[in-house]
Every structure is written in structure tokens, then in C-alpha cells.
Amino acid sequence: MATLKANKRTDFKRSTLQKIRHSGHVPGVIYGKNTDNLAVSLDSIDLLKTLRDEGKNTIITLDVNGETKSVMVTELQTDPLKNELVHADFQVVDLQREIEADVPVQLIGESKGVKDGGVLQQPLFELSITAKPKDIPQHIEADITNLEVNDVLTVADLPVQSSYQVNNDPEEVVASILPPQQSEVPEPDSEEEPKEPEAIKEKDNDGE
């Protein structure tokens, strides 16, 4: 569990927010049940590095001027033109109470079906789970090694873990192997052009 330092914000002018961002920090807000919203700022690079290394559902200890809070990132706002972080939302979590979270699905292995020319499809990229904050995995692995052509891997096929509960429909498809795609080759035209009918000569019956 990472610990990041944050500073309390009391000035909400636009010019102040711009100064915060120009200094390499990102403004944010901490909120939660039975707690007042708290405006903060923290180093944007440290925050992004933590999320990249430990996953989006990691628990972060925010040290706000000496007072610590256990939080999760619930939203990140970015400027698409400048490609920079402009705001972050943090939710205070109770480490002893279960919460819902979306966790990425990571396919592992090379399926037999793909080796035989089949096409891998993955319609499900995240699983909804319920777990205590510290038990939320960075990702959930789905082994596709034994999948052959026309096989499917469903949520029910994933390994059962006691540390979290999966909320998705057990029959929901995680991955499947489609048959090889065959390109249709047009058959040559073997039909001969019809011959013109022969002209039929009529014999004149002129009394000769």
C-alpha cells in the first residue's frame, strides 16, 4: 500500500489551480461516508506512477499535512490536448468493509485453437467483484491454453477465490475461439456460351 503526501487546499481561484498544475501537482478532493469533503493537491507523477505500478484499485494512504487517510481513486480527469492530469477524486475506504470494484481480466496462455488457425475473441475485459479493499486484485487471470476451436470460456470457468466474490453472470463469456476465416475463391465459369441455333431453310413449293 503506497503512501503519498498531499497538501490541503483552501484557495479555489482558477489562477491558483493553474499554479498548482504548472508546479507538477494535481488538485483533488477527498470524500466519503461520514466525512467532510477535503480539497487537496499532490504530485501528479507520483500518483500516476503508483496507479501504473499497483493498479487502479490500489489502496493509497494519503498523508494530508500529517493526517493520514486510506483512499481509492474513483476518477481521474485529464486534458486531452495537453495530455496531462487536471483533477483527481479520492474516496475514503473502511479497510474492514467490503466494496464493489471493477477489475481487469488478463488472458494468459496460447490456446490450442489459435495454434490451429482459430480466431480469439474477448468480449469481457473487466469483472465486477465484491471484496475488502486490501483483497482487491490488480487483475484476474483467465487461462485460455486448453481452448480449442468453437470452445468458450465463461465466468463460471474462472478459478474460485475466497478473498473476493464475482458479481457477473456465471454464463457470461470471457473468451472464445472462432473457426478459421476462409476467404471465398470464386469458381471459374465452366459454362460454355450457348451456340446460335442453325438457320432452317424452308423448301419452296413452287410446283417444280
Curated annotation (Swiss-Prot):
GO MF entry, a single one: structural constituent of ribosome
Q: GO BP, one example?
A: translation
Q: Which GO terms describe its cellular component?
A: cytosolic large ribosomal subunit
Which segments show compositional bias classed as Acidic residues? Answer: 186-195
Q: Where is the composition biased (Basic and acidic residues)?
A: 196-208
Q: What does this protein do?
A: This is one of the proteins that binds to the 5S RNA in the ribosome where it forms part of the central protuberance.
Please name the PANTHER family in this protein's record.
Answer: RIBOSOMAL PROTEIN L25/GLN-TRNA SYNTHETASE, ANTI-CODON-BINDING DOMAIN-CONTAINING PROTEIN (PTHR33284), RIBOSOMAL PROTEIN L25_GLN-TRNA SYNTHETASE, ANTI-CODON-BINDING DOMAIN-CONTAINING PROTEIN (PTHR33284:SF1)
Q: Which family does it belong to?
A: Belongs to the bacterial ribosomal protein bL25 family. CTC subfamily.
Could you tell me which HAMAP family the record lists for this protein? Ribosomal_bL25_CTC
This chain belongs to which protein, by name? Large ribosomal subunit protein bL25
UniProt organism field: Bacillus pumilus (strain SAFR-032)
What broad taxonomic lineage does this protein's source fall under? Bacteria, Bacillati, Bacillota, Bacilli, Bacillales
What's the name of its gene?
Answer: rplY
